[in-house]
Amino acid sequence: MKLTGFKAEYKIWLEKNGAIFGDGLCDLLSSISGLGSISRASRELGMSYRAAWGKIRVAEKKWGIPLVVTRVGGAAGGWAKLTPEADELLKTYCRLQQEVDEFVQNLTVKFFTGR
């Protein structure tokens, strides 16, 4: 029997002190970075502002690093941006995910196409 047409699926996340960095927090931080606002990022992702801040605060507390810096509104408007630590974590997680994707793809070819 020839085993073809299969695709390997997986989920990857990082865990430290009970807080998880996976697709959800990755998407949130990426949106904050791109939009400059926790409020806009949370709306874009279909979550409440409170839920977004909750995810950020739990991770910050458990990991002992700041993730987001904010400035309250006013005439010039408020903003939010990632800390250097959060930016590095986000970029490193994306690289890890890309390399694992390639690895899993290669294994799938090896085991399910016979190449």
Sequence positions of predicted segments:
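Short helix-boundary/capping micro-motifs
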Residues: L35-S42
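Central "turn" residue of the DNA-binding helix-turn-helix
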Residues: G46-M47
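Residues within the DNA-recognition helix of helix-turn-helix
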Residues: K55
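Short, Lys/Arg-enriched N-terminal segment that forms or immediately precedes the first helix
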Residues: T4-N17
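Basic, amphipathic "hinge/linker" alpha-helix immediately C-terminal to the N-terminal HTH DNA-binding motif
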Residues: T70-R95
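Alpha-helical linker/hinge and terminal dimerization helices associated
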Residues: L89-F111
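Residue cluster at the C-terminal edge of the helix-turn-helix DNA-binding motif
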Residues: K61-P66
